[in-house]
Amino acid sequence: MAAGKEIRGKIKSVENTKKITKAMEMVAASKMRKAQDRMRAARPYAEKVRNIAAHLGEANPEYVHPFMKANDAKAAGIIVVTTDKGLCGGMNTNVLRAVTTKLRELQSTGVDVQSVAIGNKGLGFLNRVGAKVVAHATGLGDTPHLDKLIGPVKVLLDAYAEGKINAVYLSYTKFINTMKQESVVEQLLPLSSEQMQAQKTGHGWDYIYEPDAQSVIDELLVRYVESLIYQAVAENMASEQSARMVAMKAATDNAGNVINELKLVYNKTRQAAITKELSEIVAGAAAV
């Protein structure tokens, strides 16, 4: 029964793997709910800041913030948001494929691309393909912290404000629902005039500025862009946990199928061995 012993060992090994994937599935499900709550909580803030900035812009049409001005620089920036860890299906592969397409599109027009990586997977990929990585942020954990994101992202925001790059793109995995996530590459800068339209209300707005309107608008638009990046990272984290939960569930189900198949093989092997022994006993008795 050497073969039977080997099969039992395989069954035990797969059962242990199944326990691990099941535990990871449950942990991911718990983290997913928290990540979704953070993602939803961030949306009203970004919308409120955008609306206030839009009202201020309408009240001061003579001032146009650098983030809303186009320029002719032959360079662009892209912020690539991925995960720090794997075991989340094809999520990172999909977003990096979209990034590759965007990089080729920009480089084909002679545009020099500067990259900021958020997440280990994106950083490793950009280094492998020889992209120009000007800053990165890794080890964010399960909760996005704006103070960890501001430093790396500010490199591209400052470059745009100074006219060194003509656009900033943001690539991440957009959360649709638990079973569906979508890889996107969105233009972050310049901000479009449609994007900065204020919500129509039935009353007028009158502000008292301290120290002045330009300073307030400058600060608000920077906060708005930062909130968009935070929102993207929050959505990416919610997508990560959803994708990991689905991937670990699939792994657990597959492990169960493998165990059933191995048990069937073991039972057939054991039955064949017993049949052989009985045949030998009968043959021996007949010979006597």
UniProtKB/Swiss-Prot annotation:
CDD domains for the chain: F1-ATPase_gamma (cd12151)
Name the predominant localization: membrane
Q: GO CC terms for this protein?
A: plasma membrane; proton-transporting ATP synthase complex
Question: Which GO biological-process labels does this protein carry?
Answer: proton motive force-driven plasma membrane ATP synthesis
How is this protein situated with respect to the membrane?
Peripheral membrane protein
Which GO-annotated molecular functions does the record name? ATP binding; proton-transporting ATP synthase activity, rotational mechanism
What are the record keywords, sorted?
ATP synthesis, Cell inner membrane, Cell membrane, CF(1), Hydrogen ion transport, Ion transport, Membrane, Transport
| Entry's transmembrane regions | none
Question: Cellular location of this protein?
Answer: Cell inner membrane
Record text on subunit structure and interactions: F-type ATPases have 2 components, CF(1) - the catalytic core - and CF(0) - the membrane proton channel. CF(1) has five subunits: alpha(3), beta(3), gamma(1), delta(1), epsilon(1). CF(0) has three main subunits: a, b and c.
Q: What does this protein do?
A: Produces ATP from ADP in the presence of a proton gradient across the membrane. The gamma chain is believed to be important in regulating ATPase activity and the flow of protons through the CF(0) complex.
What family does this belong to? Answer: Belongs to the ATPase gamma chain family.
Which PANTHER family does the protein's record reference? ATP SYNTHASE GAMMA CHAIN, ATP SYNTHASE SUBUNIT GAMMA, MITOCHONDRIAL
Protein name, as recorded:
ATP synthase gamma chain
